[in-house]
Amino acid sequence: MIKIKRIVALLLTSVILLGVLTSCGEPKDYCEYAKERDTEGREIYYAEISVRDFGKITVLLDATTAPITVANFISLARSGFYNGLKFHRIIKDFMIQGGDPNGDGSGGSSEDIEGEFAENGHPNDISHLRGVISMARSTSPNSASSQFFICNDDAIESLDGKYAAFGYVVSGMSVVDAITDEVFPKTAYADFYNNEELDPYYGIPYHYIWAQLGNGTVEKEADKPIIEYIKILDYVPEY
């Protein structure tokens, strides 16, 4: 009887360990901030981003950290500005970018906003972890308007303090990953991904390479994922 109990205990332990190892190996469907960041006392909103043929991404918008950025994003979403626009730039192990009416990274809305990040005089406590949403911009610190990106991997060293992070994914990272996996191979840069001569460890050299190889822009218009809508939710989603 004792031997049987020991065998059963060992089997149960093995099953539990297997479950833990399996769950650790699977990418989470949310940014780690969704479980670890305290939102008490903060002004927050939630937005749903619907991407045709891929699914929905729900993001938390932190207006305490980035009030100008969040107000701008909400205004554009409620006006229907994003409806029908596309994710035009996709880079594996970095981010997916959309929100440009020109569909190529050259456009934006009619109004630029002040960049809410440290190098522009605004403290911002949201690091660019996998699942964080942030504003794209040109070389000018106050040039962001409508283009945004969602990190599909951590990019703390290259982006923190330089770009206005304003929220994070609470559900739908699987959608971000699916977009990356399916569409990144359709960029010119994909042919050189993991080429050690052209693609050294993440840092300044990456940006030079991206600029020379189309900057991660999806080559064919038909391959760019379509944003069906972005709507601001009037309820708190479960996550």
Feature locations, PLM:
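Bacterial N-terminal signal peptides that target proteins for export
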Residues: M1-L11
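Hydrophobic core
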Residues: L12, I16-V20
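Cyclophilin-like peptidyl-prolyl cis-trans isomerases
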Residues: L21-Y239
